[in-house]
């Protein structure tokens, strides 16, 4: 075994050389990477080079790393590294995932979740979180059942198009909490300083939080009335009452929204629905 090969390289029963990271060097000079990529000698007989650091340089000067990244002869990335998921956890109806480390050559990441373990082949995802900078992400308001998650890194090439790294391994998780149906505001009535709100009954709901606020905020990418600002009012409803009244509301412009809740999580704490549509009212 040549001294130029990685330390620990051994010969297998077929006469191939195998490095500790799983790179296979065949007798004809073909090098097979752990992901199955084959690098072959060129027409002139020049062979790919297996380096001490477990990288492989092909006959054109491109260097392949076992982390999935590729660089050209000038050291520029032509593919970012493969994403590696460190941990996937479930909190009520939220699925959270954390990457092991930053992918070499990456600018940002796309996270996906779906109901099929074949989703990377079919491209059928339930939700996609694109263009994320952080090494962690969360999918909120997921229904009860089995879910599959994955991630890949990307950067923009000279043409401005995304260049993707390999997909991570798929991870399977189970959500045991039941997400309530999203309520819909059907009617808002203003009479003097009183605001009456009617909304639809939500399936799998045990109650509602109805908010009237002069400020909007965002939760999990959704616009909703904020429980902050100079003026806000909150009605916490237990049961299936679908009409609430806010009295003595000060003058100004307000936003109204609500979400449903139940106690189906393992710790019996509240599991929320997505926020309803937002209605705007002006109080004189």
Place the predicted regions along the sequence by residue.
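An aromatic-rich alpha-helical recognition segment common to small helix-rich domains
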Residues: 99-100, 111, 151, 199, ...
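Proline-enriched interdomain boundary motifs that mark the N-terminal boundary
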Residues: 79-87, 178-187
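Hydrophobic loop/turn residues within beta-sheet-rich immunoglobulin-like superfamily modules
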Residues: 88, 102, 141-142, 188, ...
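Extracellular fibronectin type III
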Residues: 158-177, 264-284
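Conserved aromatic anchor
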Residues: 95-104, 195-204
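Recognizes extended acidic, P/S/T-rich segments that occur
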Residues: 110-142, 209-249
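Beta-strand-rich modules
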Residues: 142-157, 248-267
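Repetitive, compositionally biased segments used for assembly/scaffolding
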Residues: 1-79
């Amino acid at each position: 075994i040549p001294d130029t090969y990685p330390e620990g390289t051994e010969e297998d029963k077929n006469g191939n050389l195998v490095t500790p990271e799983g790179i296979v060097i065949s007798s004809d000079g073909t090098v097979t990477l752990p992901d199955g990529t084959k690098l072959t000698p060129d027409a002139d007989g020049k062979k790919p080079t297996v380096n001490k650091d477990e990288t492989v340089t092909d006959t054109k000067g491109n260097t392949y790393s076992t982390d999935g990244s590729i660089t050209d002869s000038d050291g520029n990335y032509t593919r970012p590294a493969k994403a590696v998921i460190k941990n996937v956890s479930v909190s009520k109806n939220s699925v959270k995932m954390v990457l092991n480390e930053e992918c070499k050559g990456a600018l940002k990441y796309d996270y996906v979740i779906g109901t099929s373990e074949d989703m990377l082949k079919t491209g059928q995802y339930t939700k996609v979180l694109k263009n994320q900078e952080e090494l962690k992400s969360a999918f909120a308001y997921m229904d009860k059942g089995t879910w599959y998650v994955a991630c890949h890194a990307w950067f923009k090439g000279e043409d401005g198009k995304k260049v993707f790294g390999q997909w991570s391994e798929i991870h399977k998780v189970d959500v045991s909490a039941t997400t309530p149906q999203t309520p819909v505001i059907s009617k808002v009535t203003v009479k003097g300083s009183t605001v009456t709100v009617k909304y639809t009954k939500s399936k799998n709901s045990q109650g509602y939080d109805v908010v009237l606020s002069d400020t909007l905020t965002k939760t999990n990418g959704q616009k909703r009335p904020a429980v902050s600002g100079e003026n806000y009012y909150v009605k916490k409803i237990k049961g299936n009452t679908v009409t609430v009244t806010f009295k003595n509301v000060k003058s100004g412009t307000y936003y109204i929204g609500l979400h449903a809740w139940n106690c189906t999580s393992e710790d019996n704490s509240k599991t929320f629905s997505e926020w309803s549509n937002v209605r705007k009212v002006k109080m004189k």
